[in-house]
């Protein structure tokens, strides 16, 4: 047997499986030939121990609380970079030079307008429709307007589609918000940066001048960076799976948005904010801590723990700082929700129960407070998540298209239904 392979014994028969090495993190065992050698599949619900692809975009070390994009720590990117710089990094693999950054920013900014006919899509929805429902429909419909960039075999068309989606998502998200609250749409302005443009499209009204607060714009930009990509999560895997069939990029991103809408994925910050509201005051925290520890109580602390992180989510530290900056800039000194959040965090980092179960604050814990302070209703939280994550989805989709090992996704199953049986005519049943 090759020293780079592993031997698996199944019912007295051996199977030789190839070991594949990672740059950092766990190596993987290639099981593609397992069925051929043993006539057996592996069983791993939720992909707990299964790598579905090879990727060079994002790395997470959940035990150490590390998040890297193309090798760069998220802390450094959020502190020193801006969102479009991170977009360039995710798409192309390297940080841009000054000239590359200027050119990339220009190309994104000049794709922010959407076809005027798109406005008719919004009028077809009820005003009280959830903005995520609207986003699913409108993003999927982009392929009907921009069918000159849907040939996935053409690298140029793929890149044009990538830029279009990164550029148009803020416009569509702002339109969804404006339609939801009954205000007129606001067109983008090419002389504003990405985050400032988005805030203006959301909060400007025709009857008065709107000046973007640079502190709030920087906070919005940082929130986008923190949500740009997060490895092979549910929505990213959905985008890859849809893309493996050859679906156009707009359809793939719409599929990702639909998956992100699930409360276990993109809706966590909304649930965390609702939990803080339910607790109400700091003096009620012990009551809810006791409930969280009670196995028979359905109450769960939202914003704590993570499927991957078994340490402090590095994004949570940055989000906490951002929350303080936003509240300070807006003069919100005695926000009860922030007081509750800070005390809950203190308890979680010192209480043996939370430490033993590795329940540390995650990025959703502070993001809800921050977005609420910026003026967004809870129904928009997941929309903002989708807006930011679009670049990650696109980068992962492009990588999947270019990977020669990838083919259409076709998971196997453990069948537990009825064995072969004969059809019985209706008259004899």
UniProtKB/Swiss-Prot annotation:
Cited InterPro entries: Citrate_synth-like_lrg_a-sub (IPR016142), Citrate_synth-like_sm_a-sub (IPR016143), Citrate_synthase (IPR002020), Citrate_synthase_AS (IPR019810), Citrate_synthase_bac-typ (IPR024176), Citrate_synthase_sf (IPR036969), Citrate_synthase_typ-I (IPR010953)
EC number: 2.3.3.16
GO molecular function: citrate (Si)-synthase activity
Pfam families the UniProt entry points to: Citrate_synt
Cited Gene3D superfamilies: 2.20.28.60, Citrate Synthase, domain 1 (1.10.580.10), Cytochrome P450-Terp, domain 2 (1.10.230.10)
Active site per database record: 306, 364
Keywords for the protein's UniProt record, in alphabetical order: Plasmid, Transferase, Tricarboxylic acid cycle
Lineage top rank: taxon: Bacteria
Reactions performed catalytically: oxaloacetate + acetyl-CoA + H2O = citrate + CoA + H(+)
Pathway membership, UniProt: Carbohydrate metabolism; tricarboxylic acid cycle; isocitrate from oxaloacetate: step 1/2
GO cellular component: cytoplasm
Enzyme class, spelled out: transferase
GO-annotated biological processes: tricarboxylic acid cycle
Known function: The exact function of the plasmid-encoded citrate synthase is not clear, it could help nodulation by allowing the bacteria to use citrate as a chelator of iron and calcium.
NCBIfam families recorded: cit_synth_I, PRK05614.1
UniProt family annotation: Belongs to the citrate synthase family.
Name under which the protein is recorded: Citrate synthase, plasmid
């Amino acid at each position: 047997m090759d020293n780079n392979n592993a031997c698996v014994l199944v019912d007295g028969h051996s199977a030789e499986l190839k070991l594949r090495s990672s740059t950092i993190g766990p190596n993987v065992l290639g099981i593609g030939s397992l069925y051929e050698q043993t006539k057996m599949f592996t069983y791993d619900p939720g992909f707990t121990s299964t790598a579905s692809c090879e990727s060079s975009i994002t790395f997470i070390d959940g035990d150490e609380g590390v998040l890297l994009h193309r090798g760069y720590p998220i802390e450094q990117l959020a502190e020193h970079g801006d969102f479009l710089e991170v977009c360039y990094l995710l798409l192309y693999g390297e940080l841009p030079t000054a000239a590359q950054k200027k050119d990339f920013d220009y190309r994104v900014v000049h794709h922010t307008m959407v076809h005027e006919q798109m406005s008719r899509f919004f009028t077809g929805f009820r005003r009280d429709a959830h903005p995520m429902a609207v986003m699913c429909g409108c993003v999927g419909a982009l392929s009907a307007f921009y069918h000159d960039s849907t040939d996935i075999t053409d690298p140029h068309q793929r890149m044009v589609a990538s830029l279009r989606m990164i550029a148009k998502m803020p416009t569509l998200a702002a339109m969804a918000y404006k339609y939801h609250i009954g205000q007129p749409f606001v067109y983008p302005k090419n002389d504003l940066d990405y985050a400032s443009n988005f805030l203006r499209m959301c909060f400007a009204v025709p009857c008065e001048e709107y000046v973007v607060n640079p502190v709030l714009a920087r906070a919005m930009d940082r929130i986008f960076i923190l949500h740009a990509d997060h490895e092979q999560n549910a929505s990213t895997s959905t985008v890859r799976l849809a893309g493996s069939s050859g679906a156009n990029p707009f359809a793939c991103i719409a599929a990702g948005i639909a998956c992100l809408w699930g409360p276990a994925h993109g809706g966590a910050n909304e649930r965390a904010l609702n939990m803080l509201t339910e607790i109400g005051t700091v003096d009620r925290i012990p009551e809810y801590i006791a409930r969280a520890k009670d196995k028979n109580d359905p109450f769960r602390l939202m914003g704590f723990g993570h499927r991957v992180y078994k340490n402090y989510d590095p994004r949570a530290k940055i989000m906490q700082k951002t929350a303080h900056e936003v509240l300070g800039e807006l003069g919100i000194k005695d926000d009860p929700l922030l007081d509750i959040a800070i005390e809950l965090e203190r308890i979680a980092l010192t209480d043996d129960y939370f430490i033993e179960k590795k329940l540390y604050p995650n990025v959703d814990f502070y993001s809800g407070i921050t977005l609420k302070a910026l003026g967004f209703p809870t129904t928009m939280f997941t929309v903002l998540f989708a807006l930011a994550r679009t670049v990650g989805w696109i980068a992962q989709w492009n990588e999947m298209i270019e990977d020669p090992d990838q083919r259409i996704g076709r998971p196997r199953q453990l069948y537990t239904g009825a064995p072969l049986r004969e059809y019985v005519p209706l008259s004899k049943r």
